[in-house]
Amino acid sequence: IIMENTGATLTGKASVDKPWLQFYPEALRNVEVPTITVETFLRAKNPDENKIAFEYYGNKITWKEFWGEVDKAAKSLKILGFGEENRIPVFLQSVPAHFILLIAAERIGAAIICRDDIPEELCFAIRKSKSETAFVMDYTSKSDEDLFRATTPMKRVIKVSPYDYADRKSVPDYVEKEIASRYTGAIETTEGDLTWDEFLALGKDYTEDYMAQEDANRPVFGAYTSGSTGISKLVIHSSSNIVATAFQMSIFIPPSDVPEKWWLPILPPALIAVTVSMAIFPLSAGLIMVLD
């Protein structure tokens, strides 16, 4: 049997024949998906480091600035003892720090583990990560933090504020009202806790080579996802998985001489769909990511 339009001989196995390709333009039928790291992919797609990568409440972050923050974060992760094969619990909304941590983890050969759930389920994720450090939003309550410390190996919390990387004067009143509503319980800073800026400062004197050997098939991002099959399950993604997903969508975005933007509203929890389909994809297509 010969497939119409492509002339390919059919085997009867959809995974081999890929019959859907007959409906694609010829130029796209045999596109090869690159097996590269997320950072290599984004750099290739955004060679001009003076171009804006993110807009966040009045602050424009260029690619040069973004890579600089990644460098700081990677060094600080090494100071905290993270390295290859380690898992880093990261429970953040879609704020700039999340994307910085993703690439920083990739550089040192680690993986970030993300979850948005009840405190007990977050504790489970920390225990499975076997990590003494977790990254959380700074409105995490004292009772939740106490639970983390009592039931997991966690000894240190890095607290990220919604205002980190924002121009506070540019934040609309309705957004400030929403942010304020997140601080519902008692909040306490325990000895050893750090702000995001304090975390970045940890590695300022780090001079060793922190880069792990580049491996696109190494796990870099894990997210607990659920649906109709019961409790949330951890799904691990390698750099090449993420690149493949973003690449196959980005090829449909034509180049533009005019800076185009991709709006990600309500700062949703940074799980897999948000991170890859709603962020890495538009960034790889050369769009400016507006986090709002």
Regions found by a protein language model. Give the residues of each.
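Conserved AMP-binding/adenylation subdomain of ANL enzymes
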Residues: 109, 243-262, 269-292
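Conserved ATP-dependent adenylate/AMP-binding module captured primarily in the ANL superfamily
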Residues: 117-151, 243-264
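Conserved pre-ATP/AMP-binding loop-to-beta segment of ANL
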Residues: 159, 177, 181-224, 231, ...
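Conserved AMP-binding/adenylate-forming core of the ANL superfamily
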Residues: 33, 52-81, 86-95, 99-103, ...
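AMP-dependent adenylate-forming
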Residues: 14-22, 39-62
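Conserved structural elements of the adenylate-forming
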Residues: 67-72, 200-206, 235-256
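Conserved AMP-binding A3 loop
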Residues: 62-64, 188, 220-246
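Short beta-strand->loop structural element characteristic of the AMP-binding/adenylate-forming
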Residues: 89-91, 98, 102, 106-137, ...
